[in-house]
Structures are given as C-alpha cells and as structure tokens.
Amino acid sequence: MTTPQLPLQDQLRGFSRALFSTWIYHRRFNILFDAGEGVATALFNRVFGIRRIFLSHGHADHIAGLVNLINIRNLGAGDQTASLKIYFPKNNRLIDLLREYLSRTQNGLSFDLEWIGVDENEQVWLEDQKSRIFIRTFRTKHSNKQLSLGYNVIEIRRRLKDKYHGLGQKQLNEIIWAYGKDEIAEDIEKIIFSYGGDSRPIDPDSVRQSMFLCHECTYLSIEDDERNFQQHSHLEEVLEIAAQADVETLLLFHSSLRYSLEVLKEQICLGMQKIKAKFRVLVLYGDHIIDPLAEDFPKNSRKKTREKEFEQVIVEGDQ
C-alpha cells in the first residue's frame, strides 16, 4: 500500500472561479487537470514537471491556459525535452480548433507533444509511478453539445481475502508456505483522487469511496441559477452526492463570484449539519484551498487582501 507523504490537499495547487479559469495540479502524479487561463503564470517553472494533462471539456475557462503553457515548455529555462501528453474528450470541436492553432504557431517543438482523445470508461496507466496506478475516465453532464469527462486516479492495492480474516500470523504463514501469497491476498481498486470538471451532480457510483473528490459547486442554491442553464451544480446536491458516494474528503471548486468566503463558510456549515455529513469539506477559493470549518478560518481575509493590494497600488503610484 502506498501512503502519501503529505495530506492530499497539500499535494495540490490550483485556481478556480466560475467563468474565469479552472485548473488543478496534482504534484504527486505530475498531472494537470484542466488548464484554465493563468496556469503557467501561477506554476512558473513547475510547468516543466507536468507529464500529463487531462481536460474535462473544451470551454475556454478550462483550456485557454494551454497556449502559454506549451509556449513556455518550448522556450523557458527548464527541461525542454520532457514529453507531454494531453488527454481530452474525443471529437471535441473546440479542442480541435485549439490544436489547429497551436500546430500553426508552435511548430518545431523541442519536446514530444501527444494529443490523445478518450471516451468514457477508458484507462490510462501511469507507467512512471512506482505503484500500480492508472486513470479511469467517467462521463459527466455539462453540455449537450460536447462530451465531458471526469477522471479517477486509481491505485491497485493488495488486501487479505475475507475468508482469512481472524487468522493469526502463524496460521497465515502456514497457508503462504503451502500455497503461496496469492492464496490469502487479492487485488482491489482504490480511488485515491477524483476530478469532475464542470458538471451537473456526478453519479455517486462513478466516484464511490473516493479518498478525495473534486466536485464543482457553482451555486449555493438552485435559485441562483437564474438563466436555468442546468449545466452546473449547487451546494445541497453536491453534499448529497458526496454522502451517497461515501467519500473521505470533498473539495468544492468553481464557485460563482457572487459569494464571499464568509457566505460560503456559513452555507457549507448549514449544509453539512443538515445531512449530518461524516466527510471533510474543503474549498478551492481562487488559488487558496481552505477548510471552512476550521476554527482559525480567516474572517474577512479576502477583503483585507484587497485593501492591502489597493494600498500598494496607491503607494507605487505616488512614487
């Protein structure tokens, strides 16, 4: 069994605000999930460590950052020879247009760039990982005009077969000596990370018992979807999905700009109390992963940050 050296949330870098940009970088696996605007600017030379990119769909706020990322990988001061694979929902017209643009403006790349179209329920093995780890795609519901996908990071683990539970180590050793290790142990698939992209509520069976589910939460209530596009999720249904799927940690992202951090905290607390949630909830608010239930939750932190930025602009302007 592979135990992460850091808590899962500490292995992530990301940014997400509805309409503007969404991306999440998983440092343990060198994987980028979606590539919204600003990803290369935020990661700087860390972009050279990315080995695979998994795109959930082709909307601009999830793919616009690819242009600069590929340019920096080609010209920046890093390993310009490391290959990059980009997985995307197959037959996506918007992504095909971006690929055409990049082929015209970024010809003669210094590294191998491979675009791989995938469908639902496909597997991608991560050969560069020491453990037996692979990605499995699952279908999401976002746009009627294009296929959208979510991604599970799955680790193959070994466990004791049920019929041998309760036996002592001496008895187990005797069975191993007589029949081999495979007699007492079996492989199981464990979802250690799930990313859903933009989506209506994900099917709980697709992410069942995930250790860490990233699920969009654009709205706090269904009434806030004034245009009734029905392409996104609201808080109550996301919490219910996480409970039904029996996940360990839920990371909410893609929140609307209308909500302050304090409002998100209040509504998340109420929502979790309502369903008596047993899982942990985190929020990717801009570029910060925050625990809204923590006692040291930074009240008015966003307001104070903006005030400091404004004061800095005034000082620099006076100079």
Annotated model-derived regions:
Residues 39-87:
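Active-site metal-binding motif and surrounding structural segment of the metallo-beta-lactamase
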Residues 65-73, 98-103, 260-269:
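Metal-dependent catalytic neighborhoods of phosphoester/phosphodiester hydrolases
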Residues 72-80, 105-106, 160, 183-185, ...:
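Alpha-helix termini
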Residues 79-82, 92-119, 258:
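Active-site neighborhood of divalent metal-dependent phosphoester bond hydrolases
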Residues 127-208, 212-214:
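Active-site-proximal loop/helix segment associated with metal-binding centers of metalloenzymes
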Residues 124-137, 152, 291-306:
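Short, surface-exposed amphipathic charged segments that create phosphate/polyanion-binding patches used
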Residues 1-46, 52, 149-153, 159-160, ...:
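Conserved beta-strand hairpin/beta-sheet module of binuclear metal-dependent hydrolase folds
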Residues 85-86, 93-94, 177-291:
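Cap/insert and terminal regions of metallo-dependent hydrolase folds
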